[in-house]
Amino acid sequence: MKSIMETSLKRIVHLLLLAALSILTVNAKVISYPAPKGETLSSDYMVEVDGVSVPVYMAKTQHHDKKYSIAYFDFSGTVTVKIKSKLSLDHLNILPDKYAIHPSVNKDIATFHLNEPCDISFEPDGCNSPLILFCNELETDIPSKNDPNVIYFGPGEHNPENGLIRLGSNQTLYLAGGAV
């Protein structure tokens, strides 16, 4: 009797572990990076990718007559992107056209699917306040921050001396997710 109970208990534990691993695998296909302290978040957009919230920043540009928002995430497989906009979505364009992204729109939320890395411009009612999305593949060959040939900027805000970064021969500049 004890042997049957032990076997049943082991099977239940194995099934629970498999279920937990499958949940982790599903959630592991999207990586979003926390917003660094001091970055201004956009009040125009909210982005969610497969249920994962993605911070949306206000871009710092020289074009003071326009507002730009940016967001980025890493992913693999096919993901569902939901963008909530305070701007009208009546005349929405997603560029470039080569990706042929045609979202479904329900009031203030646009939903579409991505299955490959891309950089796109989400432009509600023209391009006065676009959201630029950097949709990257999952990283596989992350350089070591201890490598003497790597200039490594980890998550957070960085202000290089004099605003310049000088690379020497055979040096690599690496910006980790969440670095600005």
Residue ranges of predicted features:
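N-terminal secretory signal peptides that target proteins for export/translocation
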Residues: 1-10
